[in-house]
């Protein structure tokens, strides 16, 4: 006889416990496997120095949840996000303010995503800034550290020349842009 076995395979836990478990484990990936120099999210646990721009945005949001839920302190979260922002600002190659899909987390150099994708990636940059803008809103205390972080995020956000990435002056943005192709 064929059919679906609908017996429980795992222990049932209350919804709140499940939410906590998912949030904690998601956060742990970004926290534990963040690049030691840049703080950015690695593409995979086995990717060495390759970090991902969009994944870093997801990681920043996970850090905000972790601070709010008490998995880490607010200070730990602000320090890691500032580390990422400083790396983006001082070390990374930016293309009219936008970043590549993949970056070398030790040097800031663009790591080509494919043969002709060796420049800006607006989708990944957008995902990164979703996290950073959420951090800018979350870290709203009137302290020197949080004020500096907000100012740095704002400066990077405003440095993106979205208009430059318009396709032939139309109301369409390029997804990828390469300095070579």
Identify the role of each PLM range.
Residues 6-16, 58-72, 87, 127-142:
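Well-ordered alpha-helical scaffold segments within catalytic/enzyme domains
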Residues 6-51, 95-98:
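Low-complexity, Ser/Thr/Pro/Gly-enriched N-terminal "stalk/linker" regions
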